[in-house]
């Protein structure tokens, strides 16, 4: 009607990444090719934070002026950018980064040199820290007539769901509470209607992020590299 083209595709799941172990990473960017060179050097420590999918923390532990303040601020900025663009363009969360050491050159150090040093140290740290894919988990509640309980439970299990409990709904039916990965919930409304002759209803809301199984992580990583 309005002559506007739309890109239509499957809904996207907001996967994230985190790390499983604490590591120390260092990168020294030093180049000399006649005239002014390039020099930037940072040492960082990375460690997992409490799970929650909320973000990351950067702590400046530089002492004695081994890196000038302007380059420390730049390292923080670069790490913040990379925390949202690492590997498969996924946000990195629940990671604490400490800038613990480094060095600079009075003449050769520059913003570019420290950008490169900080970015490579971050990437090397992520490689060493056993990165893991996190997927959003939904709290799902299904209200269904009792005769369809088996079909509802079986379908939730096929969707990698974990059933947390069942209650009477007060009108002769059952209320099922479960946690299910968001990626498995696409098309659920249609499937539920079909399995229960339209007599069951459901609701869902975000609950948490949880580490995805290895085969899911591999598939997501491969798809996002394309």
Curated annotation (Swiss-Prot):
Keyword Cytoplasm: yes
Alphabetized Gene3D superfamilies for the sequence: 3.30.230.10, 3.30.70.240
Origin superkingdom: Bacteria
Principal localisation: cytoplasm
Pfam families: EFG_C, EFG_IV
InterPro entries to which the protein is assigned, alphabetical: EFG_III/V, EFG_IV, EFG_V, EFG_V-like, Ribosomal_Su5_D2-typ_SF, Ribsml_uS5_D2-typ_fold_subgr, Transl_elong_EFG/EF2_IV
Keywords, sorted A to Z: Cytoplasm, Elongation factor, GTP-binding, Nucleotide-binding, Protein biosynthesis
Compartments where located: Cytoplasm
Function: Catalyzes the GTP-dependent ribosomal translocation step during translation elongation. During this step, the ribosome changes from the pre-translocational (PRE) to the post-translocational (POST) state as the newly formed A-site-bound peptidyl-tRNA and P-site-bound deacylated tRNA move to the P and E sites, respectively. Catalyzes the coordinated movement of the two tRNA molecules, the mRNA and conformational changes in the ribosome.
Family: Belongs to the GTP-binding elongation factor family. EF-G/EF-2 subfamily.
Protein name: Elongation factor G
Chain's gene name: fusA
